[in-house]
Amino acid sequence: MNLNSTPKICFIIGMMPRTGTNWAYDILMQSNHTGNIGPIWEDNLLNHVETLESAAKKIASSWDSKWKADHQKIEVLRLTESLQKNFELGLEKFVHQQFLTSSCEADNPTYLILKSPNAWHIKPPKTLLQRNKCIILTRNPHDLIASGMASFGWGLFGACNRYIESTKAIVQLNDSCNQCLTISFEDLKENLCESVQQLYNYLDISLPSFDFSSLAVRGKSPTKKNEKMTWTAQGITSKEQIQKHKTSKIFMSKIQHMVVSELCITAGKSLGYSFGAQKTPNVVRWGIRAAFRLFCFVRKLKG
């Protein structure tokens, strides 16, 4: 397959659910230059590079020391890089083949848009993003975790741990592939027009004549028996809604906000978010840290 003559791929990766993955996807799908591949195949596709590393390490670690093959262990790990490049090429071909058999409305799109609300375990690609594009969506930890707890029933410590690990993956991805575009949920909500223009400029495609404030945004909530919900962008981007949100502490208690502040402040700052002075008493902070370490230890034991 000649990759130069096929559409490029734009991966939309939300650091976690509730970061606006569907929103950004729907914004870009209003263009005649974008297409999809039918089913949402991309969800977790980029996460499987870790499987290659695990397989290589598992093979090498099983070798008996009597074989004196330590130097071969290094070669096996180097082989992983070659496997990863081939894996990425195969993934790219897979996406294009799915496009050829799907009911994409655009006959010859410039980009195929794929989305995934899951940055955890993503490894920086070796060559995939040299030919394609990647949009990363972030959100401040308080609102993201509160929204996830309300919509998906997340546990507080588990959500904080996932936020921290997803942030590490995003920072590593950005450091390795500086051609990625990062947009926050707050940007979409508070500066919709500018954010839409930024998305289209990034893909170098023309902005369609469309009222993006009236765009229907889709989602669903497992805590409501997977009930599908639709709302318009205007419903969350109006000045009244933004001010209402800023003056209310949604979904979480004061102590829960303390936990998020204590555990996720470093991760949030690395994504560009700013926080007020920490007012939590030291004894409470130590207790939160100790409980979180115990949670992570027990979780690791359970595998």
Regions found by a protein language model. Give the residues of each.
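PAPS-dependent sulfation machinery
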Residues: 30-115, 120-122
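Cofactor-binding loop segments of dinucleotide-utilizing enzymes, especially the Rossmann-like FAD-
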Residues: 15, 39, 137-139
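Walker A (P-loop) phosphate-binding motif
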Residues: 5-22, 26-28
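Alpha-helical packing segments of well-folded alpha/beta enzyme cores
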Residues: 98, 166-170, 195, 256, ...
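PAPS-dependent sulfotransferase catalytic domain
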Residues: 106-210, 223-232, 236, 293-296
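PAPS-dependent sulfotransferases, especially Golgi type II membrane carbohydrate sulfotransferases
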Residues: 1-10, 205-303
